[in-house]
Amino acid sequence: MNESLSGMAGALFQQLQGAPVQQMSAQLGTDPQQTQSAIGAALPLLLGALGRNTQQPNGAEALLGALQRDHASSASGNGFDLGGLLGSVLGGGSQATTPQTDGAGILGHVFGNSAPTAAAGLGQATGLGGDKAGQLLQMLAPIVLSFLAQRFLGGGDNANPAQLGQALGQEHAQAQQSGGIAGGLLGKVLDQDGDGDLDVGDLMKLGGSLFGKH
């Protein structure tokens, strides 16, 4: 499954190999191979959900604003400091949570009220269980946004919501086309009323939660 990852999900998956996977595994108390497999499902799920959100009116602008507000430091230099960011994310109670590292808050913006559904589905599909899958998503969410900030804010004034929306839209399409865990979960998570259709009511809920006020 992980070998089929492409685009931004594949690029970020490669950056997380080695020490980051080991650190997250130690935090979760899981086998590194299982953690790696779960990351391979979680990244396209997160990026795909962001891609669907950015297709809503003003969605890309809202996400770009959140990146500029909370994650702009990741756009400086030669790339975001993955080791430092992961250390902050895994620091737990020893460090004050900031908007940049607030994984639970970010998930709430990405998935709205369906964040528990995303965690439960990922946990069931990967064998992590809902609690550990939720923890993994909270670890990955700040990393995903910092990765996006490094990619799309690096040009300073050239930051373009249309380019961000297009790139994330491609991630959403790839996740759906590839099927697998992420593709199946995207449908369940985005169909918030459980009727099998992504309707206006579902989109209104998502739009209302998308990177609004903290």
Residue map of PLM features:
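A structural "flexibility-hinge" signal
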Residues: M1-H214
